[in-house]
Amino acid sequence: MVSSVLSIPPQTCLLPRLPISDSVNCKSKIVYCLSTSVRGSSVKRQSTARTRSFTETNRRTPSVQSKHEFWEDPDDGSDSENEYEGEEEDGIGNDLDNESDWEDDSRVQKLTTTDNYEEELAKEVEQLLEPEERVILQQNEKPNLKMISTKSWKPLQTLALSMQIQLMDNLIENGLDIDDVDKDNQTALHKAIIGKKEAVISHLLRKGANPHLQDRDGAAPIHYAVQVGALQTVKLLFKYNVDVNVADNEGWTPLHIAVQSRNRDITKILLTNGADKTRRTKDGKLALDLALCFGRDFKSYDLVKLLKIMPTGDI
C-alpha cells in the first residue's frame, strides 16, 4: 500500500477531498474530486488547485520520484510482455531462417545420395550381368525401339496407359513417332483416352499428337472420349478442332454413342458444338431412335426432350 500525507485548509471544503493523480505524469497540479455517495452512486465535482508538495513513502516499493514529486504508475508488466513478444518474433524469424537453411542442405544431401546410389547400382548390376548381356547393354546407349516393340505391344501405348510421361518423352526424343499405331491402328492418344489418363492426354496433345486419326474400326479419339464418359476430354478435343460428326465404319457418330451411353451432359455438349441430329448409322438409326429404344424411364424422356427441342449448334 502507498501512504500519503496531505494538508488541506479547513476553510476550503467541509468534505474530505481525495487527490486523484493523472495516470501518466502529473507535476504539481492535483485534481480534487468532491464526492458524495449514496448506496454506490456518487456525484463528483472537479476542481483544480495548486497546493504544496506532498511526500509519498512506501516502505516496500518506492513509487515517487522525490525530485519531480509526481505519482508513478505501478509496473503492470505490459512493457515486459512486449519485450517478450519481440523476442519471440525474433526467435520465429531465426527459426524460419534456420529451417530454410536446413531444407537447402537436405535437398543437396538428397541429390548427392541419389547420385551415389545410381553409381553404386550401375556397378552392382554390371557385375551381375553375363558377358553377352553386358554387350547388349553397352550397344544400346539409346533405347532400341525395334527390340522393345511389337505390333501388339507398342512401348508408347504401354507407357501412356501407365502414365510414364517422362519415359514417353524419352522415346519421342529418340525418334519414336508420337502417332505410332499398334495392330488395331490405335495411337498412344487412343489408349490414354480409353484409360482416362487426363494428364497423359493433355501432354500428348501439347506434344503434337494427331486427334483426328481413326483406328481399325474407324473410331476417332472423340468416339472413345464419349464412350468412357470423359466430359473434360471431350471439351479439350474440341479445342483441337476435332470433327464432331466424324463417323466410324458403321456410321456411328459421337452423338450416337453419347445417347447409347445415356449421358445427358455429353449429349448436350455435342449438340452445342454442332452435332447433327439427322445423321443416320449405316443401318438407318438416328440418335433419337436409340433414345426411344430404352423404354419409358426418366433418362429416356430426358434425352428425347433434349434431342427434340435443342437445335444443333445452340449455346
From Swiss-Prot:
GO terms for cellular component: chloroplast. ANK repeats lie at residues 151-180, 184-213, 217-246, 250-279, 283-307. Expressed in roots, inflorescence stems, flowers, siliques, dry seeds and mature cauline leaves. It holds the Pfam family Ank_2. SMART domains: ANK (SM00248). It is found in: Plastid, Chloroplast. The keyword RNA-binding does not apply. Residues 44-65 have a biased composition (Polar residues). GO terms for molecular function: molecular condensate scaffold activity. Residues 1-39 form a transit peptide. Residues 72-104 have a biased composition (Acidic residues). The keyword Metal-binding does not apply. Keywords: ANK repeat, Chloroplast, Plastid, Repeat, Transit peptide. InterPro entries: Ankyrin_rpt (IPR002110), Ankyrin_rpt-contain_sf (IPR036770). Residues 44-106 are annotated as: Disordered. Involved in the initial differentiation of the proplastid during the embryo development. Also required for correct cotyledon, true leaf and cauline leaf margin development. Interacts with AKR. No homodimerization observed. PANTHER family: ANKYRIN REPEAT DOMAIN-CONTAINING PROTEIN EMB506, CHLOROPLASTIC, ANKYRIN REPEAT FAMILY PROTEIN. This is Ankyrin repeat domain-containing protein EMB506, chloroplastic. It comes from Arabidopsis thaliana. The gene is EMB506.
